[in-house]
Amino acid sequence: MAVGKNKRLSKGKKGIKKRVVDPFSRKDWYDIKAPSFFEVKNVGKTLVNRTAGLKNANDALKGRIVEVSLADLQKDEEHSFRKVKLRVDDVQGKACLTTFNGMSMTSDKLRSLVRKWQTTIEADQTIKTTDGYVCRIFVIGFTRRRYNQIKKTTYAQSSQIRAIRQKMFQVIQNQATGCSMRELVQKLIPEIIGREIEKATGGIFPLQNVFVRKVKILKSPKLDAQKLLEQHGEAQDVGTKVIKDVAPLASV
């Protein structure tokens, strides 16, 4: 007879059930606030465990990165191919104050731009803003037919590609250098950099569908609570003028 474990004898007591604890009972919801240079301030909500012992809920929230569609932030479906990254830098009450942490294009939009019979030209430039951010801007563009062109293909020569890339470097440097992160984002949203590149490269080879493909934050400045509040419009140097209603004089 084989010696082994008898499963029938090793069963525990009947009727005793393990206590089930709802994990959401120990969590709280926090609001995610976008900077004031976006039209929509309330991005959404995030979940975190409550403060217990040495584990602080605020520390768990700081550093979280959320990805939001620019169409939702600007209330405009034309920006639906843009994705914006926001990083939680501070927590005040139940509000998570975020800063801009990068931008990219959706893969379906990028794939729809790549076609036959044209040349794809890409460039990237590292710039530094006046408020201490170091970011790398990636640009992409495509050649198009000249006016009254009969030839089907629009391939650019190597010398033309190099010249166009140099123009891209110059435009990115001129548009991004000397401005703050707020001003840079306000240039990225309406595609100012892409339009300027199309104008600058028109004499070399006409381009179409020139976009800022990606913005990558390489280095962020040290957290300044005052500047963060200014980005969210919660601390302003100049207040709004208050006009009080003057009560009419009583008749004699």
Curated annotation (Swiss-Prot):
GO molecular function term, any single one: structural constituent of ribosome
InterPro entries tied to this protein: Ribosomal_eS1, Ribosomal_eS1_CS, Ribosomal_eS1_euk
GO annotation terms (biological process): translation
Lineage: Eukaryota, Fungi, Dikarya, Ascomycota, Taphrinomycotina
One Pfam family it belongs to: Ribosomal_S3Ae
Organism: Schizosaccharomyces japonicus (strain yFS275 / FY16936)
Family the UniProt entry places it in: Belongs to the eukaryotic ribosomal protein eS1 family.
Subunit and interaction comment: Component of the small ribosomal subunit. Mature ribosomes consist of a small (40S) and a large (60S) subunit. The 40S subunit contains about 33 different proteins and 1 molecule of RNA (18S). The 60S subunit contains about 49 different proteins and 3 molecules of RNA (25S, 5.8S and 5S).
Keywords: Acetylation, Cytoplasm, Ribonucleoprotein, Ribosomal protein
Protein name stated in the entry: Small ribosomal subunit protein eS1
SMART domains: Ribosomal_S3Ae
Subcellular localization(s) per the UniProt record: Cytoplasm
Record GO cellular component, one term: cytosolic small ribosomal subunit
Positions of modified residues (N-acetylalanine): A2
Chain ranges passing through the membrane: none
